[in-house]
Amino acid sequence: MSLPPAFADWFARQGWTPHPHQLALLEATGDSLLIAPTGGGKTLAGFLPSLVELAGGWRGLHTLYVSPLKALTADIGRNLARPVADLNLPIRVEDRTGDTKASARQRQRTDPPQILLTTPESLALMLSYLEAPKIFGSLRRVVLDELHALAESKRGDQLMLGLARLRSLSPGLIATGLSATVEDPQALAGFMGGAQVVHADPGPDPDIAMLPTSRPPPWAGAGGRYAVSDVLKAVAEARTTIIFINTRAQAELFFQALWAENDQNLPIGLHHGSLAREARARVEAAMAAGELRAVVATGSLDLGIDWGDVDLVIQVGAPKNVKRLVQRIGRANHRYNAPSRARMVPANRFEVIECIAALEAVRERDLDGDARGPGPLDVLCQHILLTACAGPFDADALYAEVRSAGPYRDLSRADFDDCLNFAATGGYALRAYDRWQRLMQRGNLWGLRDPRAARDLRMNVGTIVEAEMTKVRWKRGGGLLGEVEESFAASLVPGDSFLTGGKIVRYEALRELVVEVSPSPRKEPKIAVFTGVRMPMSAELSHRVLSLIGDPSRWEVLPRPTRDWLSLQAQVSAVPRPGTLLAETFPHMGRWHIAVYGFAGHNAMQTLGLLLTRAMEESGLGPLGFSSTDYALLIWSLDPVRDLAPLLDRDKLRAGLGDWLAGNAVMKRTFKNVAIISGLIQRNMPGGRRSGKQATFSTDILYDTLRRHDPDHLLLRITAAEAGRGLVDFGRIEEMLDRSPVLDHRQLDRVSPLAAPLMLEMGRVRIEGQGRMRLAEQEAEALMQAAGLQFTDDPAGFDTPAEPPHRSRRAR
């Protein structure tokens, strides 16, 4: 299908030629999933069929656009204004997010625009009103942007349930998913409920390499601050740079370090999710206006607004996930068929290997990604309650509708009925309490027992459960700086200094749940500000790192100092390799140590440490502590472990996991999240919001009550399943044992070269002053000498070869 003449003329006036994938979506008569790189014109491709159809006029809502970011909906609205005005199209484009004024939201329920831009949460809210059939009855198209990102969380499951509801209200609507490159496009199409996959030209390979540094990476640590001067040099040579860092705490620290050495006074911004919304908006506006040379950011900028002036991305710290790295690389050079330029800065010696493995994966276009499980039942519970808010429903019809959603296509009737029973009564142990008696059956229809409950349910819509945060502002009514976690705020005493918003501040008081601060004269923050969960390395990248370390014939791609390190390890002990689980035991400074090189990701290695130390305690071996990384686990104890095999027995580990989890804080934390999403407890109440402490107190009591009186309760089953996949990640431990069936236990007389960096992680704190840094350097030097690692480091040796050895691309 060719463009209508008016649209063809408009493209010509812009100097554009329609891409084949844009025309393919224009021709599509059913659901489509477009896979295209950043800068490939995905958004215009998604809207082009709508604009063509709307040129002839339309009464009511025609196209619904759903994005994971409120900022992106606003940006899309500005971008659409141009063709709408140029082509004189008779349509209105409006957004509907949490930032939309109440008067506008009310008007949209009676007089919706032709194109409405929204988020998954706002869509769920709109579907909960009695007017939903009228609003969405005229709907013809749904555009789902950044679908690859939404599919990785419960927000995507909620969105697919909403899409199923939209199909019921407007049969025949066409859904279009827009996605960056993913590892399994057909699986993502199945997530949509079935769609035709359209592939855009992936474009040229990115220009990606390690950033040359004047100093070698440290043996341990996570900050990357050794490379600050080199990063500043790269920023000065580029037009605009995004510096990605994996955690908020490290982003604050790196930003502070950049400012300390920024002798050229380059304008540099900071952007992460805990900054005040106004502060983030200022940085975004400055980037859009070309006023910043660089911005230090976390995942808050993985998605969103396209800044055409960005010509360099720097990833500080190993990416942990190849797909995330590709997404970040794509933020540079938003021009189709122009290579993106990116540089990587490993934070430590182990991360050098991880970065090289990630570079290989990017060059081979071999992406990682966890297989999606079935649709979560806590999200379904919330969906049932919100469906009841919109009016009575038939259970059989709702079950059929839910099963039409991709994530829930295999949902059993028993699980659906359990969710319906929970939504109605709270379950067996809670059915006697009025507060959980929310639904009742009248004939064949289910509805709200008390229509007034709809208000409370709508106030708690959504699946995002973040750490409870407390606002930070300057004292005496000053401006808002950002947020910190409640648990951190509770630990502060007057005079403590910490980093927030790139500034070192002094804690003054906590007034009405707001942290008041003043400028601090200290040059070093006293304590850390964020305690968020670390991102574990993906399974696919873990396998790549292990395969690279275990095959000396491939070491030519590694920097010379890294090759020397691994060669010494092979002489002293052995190198980890696929098929074998390497473990070492050795004495050091009066203690016995165990190093297990599992390469299973941080969460799984941490769980393994908890299980092994528990078993060692029961055996009287006197474990004293452990530390874990994505690659390995280090345990120290009073007594040696002569035989590791019994401790690593799969059945014993699983039994130990069950005993440990039963009353563990991890389970209570997971239960709290499940209880909030399912609607068991409500954080937002008329007149205010429950504090995190109040919500935790309530869910802890409920968790203990259900364990005693209703151990098979639906929410306990959901909690156990989620804990196993999430923070505990026991599945990665089992996968580790499956791929490494042979235990290679090396009993050494001293610390090994690979174990030495692990020793430096013992007792590390997140933020250190200069004195502690000097002490750490002295300890590191002594430890490296003990491990035989006295060879000279040449910083230039850590640069990646200009032309890496050719490796054939894996067929997907």
Located regions from the model:
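Extended, highly charged accessory segments
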Residues: 399-402, 406-469, 483, 528, ...
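Helicase motor core with emphasis on the C-terminal RecA-like subdomain
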Residues: 1-12, 17-27, 31-40, 45-444
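Short acidic-glycine loop/turn motifs at beta-strand connectors
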Residues: 441-444, 475-477, 510-513, 639-640
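Short, well-ordered loop/turn sites that connect or cap secondary structure elements
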Residues: 18, 464-466, 492, 499
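A conserved acidic, glycine/proline-rich C-terminal tail/linker
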Residues: 478-497
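Short, solvent-exposed secondary-structure boundary/capping segments
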Residues: 511-528
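Short beta-strand-centered aromatic/proline hotspots
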Residues: 503-510
